[in-house]
Swiss-Prot record:
Alphabetical GO biological process terms: L-histidine biosynthetic process
HAMAP family for this protein: HisG_Long
Protein EC: 2.4.2.17
GO MF entry, a single one: ATP binding
Organism expressing this protein natively: Yarrowia lipolytica (strain CLIB 122 / E 150) (Yeast)
UniProt keyword Cell division, yes or no: no
Name the record gives this protein: ATP phosphoribosyltransferase
A family per Pfam: HisG_C
């Protein structure tokens, strides 16, 4: 198959090709019914049910491809968007890939405050963000900082042990890798997570909006459950405060005039507590249903 010629008239959607965001991104695409098959060693996959093509790229490159309009939309971390300094729309927080960009120093070293690193050597994969951070600490423009910012593409945590750096700035998820390298955090530069980003002038804007709507539906389905129960009318106001829904609960009359049926979306992580509170306030026949997908 000539993939290049088959890209004509297709929306291009950039996806991380590997790393911490890849698996969750692919799971999100499947939940949004974006069907595709990725051939071995190929970084382009044509959708079999929509006029789009997935382009698998390093997460760090995706903001530039989207910002320059080479692809219409993409999934990457906010840290990568900020580092690339590209003008894109952050369309959706995707609720995965959460981590922190932190200043880390040797556990047994003399540094306890990032200001102590001014004028020292810092190793990072995020040179732009590091320069901005130290420019603010030093109170000078980026071009005038005295801190020596060095770029490495990987294994940043080894820099201090190898004598290359006094401290590092790197992404930290659980912190286990940093602790294993004998490092400790002394400051957070940025909190980040995965985001759906969109070009300012995308091709196929209607298809972009449809994909965004589908992804919003998957995110809502993952976050919420449907809670149904019967409510005494004289307790309805109190019960609706417990289950207000995303916008409003659905209230339906029952044959018994003293009762009504309530249906409401509720946060999945809070549902046990919500059910306890409903029962305490007089609700009965409380049922909870999973939401496989939705549009919000």
């Amino acid at each position: 198959m000539d993939l290049v010629n088959n890209l004509n008239d297709r929306l291009l959607f950039a996806v991380p090709k590997k790393g911490r965001l890849y698996e969750k991104a692919v799971e999100l695409l499947k939940g949004s019914d974006i069907q595709f098959h990725r051939h071995n060693r190929l970084d382009i996959a044509l959708s079999t049910n929509l006029p789009l093509a997935l382009v698998f790229l390093p997460a760090a490159d995706i903001p530039r491809f989207v910002g320059e309009g080479r692809v219409a939309l993409g999934i990457t971390g906010i840290d990568q968007v900020r580092e690339a300094k590209m003008d894109v729309e952050n369309a959706l927080d995707l609720n995965f890939g959460s981590c922190k960009l932190q200043v880390q120093v040797p556990e047994k070293g003399p540094y306890t405050d990032p200001k102590q690193l001014i004028g020292k050597s810092i190793v990072t994969s995020f040179t732009s963000l590091a320069e901005e951070y130290f420019a603010e600490l030093e109170g000078v423009p980026v071009k005038d900082i005295t801190t020596n910012i060095k770029f490495v593409g990987g294994s940043v945590e080894a820099a201090c042990a190898l004598g290359v750096a006094d401290g590092i700035i790197d992404l930290v998820e659980s912190g286990e890798t940093m602790r294993a390298a004998g490092l400790k955090p002394i400051a957070t530069v940025l909190e980040t997570s995965a985001s759906l980003i969109v070009s300012k002038n995308p091709s196929h804007p209607e298809l972009v909006q449809m994909i965004k709507s589908r992804i919003e539906g998957v995110l809502a389905a993952n976050k919420y459950v449907l809670c149904n129960y019967n409510a005494p009318r004289d307790k309805l106001d109190a019960l609706l405060k417990i289950t207000p829904g995303r916008r409003a609960a659905t209230v339906s009359p029952l044959d018994d005039e003293g009762w009504c049926a309530v249906s409401s979306m509720a946060e999945k992580k809070k549902i046990a507590q919500i059910m306890d509170e409903l029962k305490k306030e007089g609700a009965s026949d409380i049922l909870v249903f999973s939401i496989s997908n939705c549009r919000v």
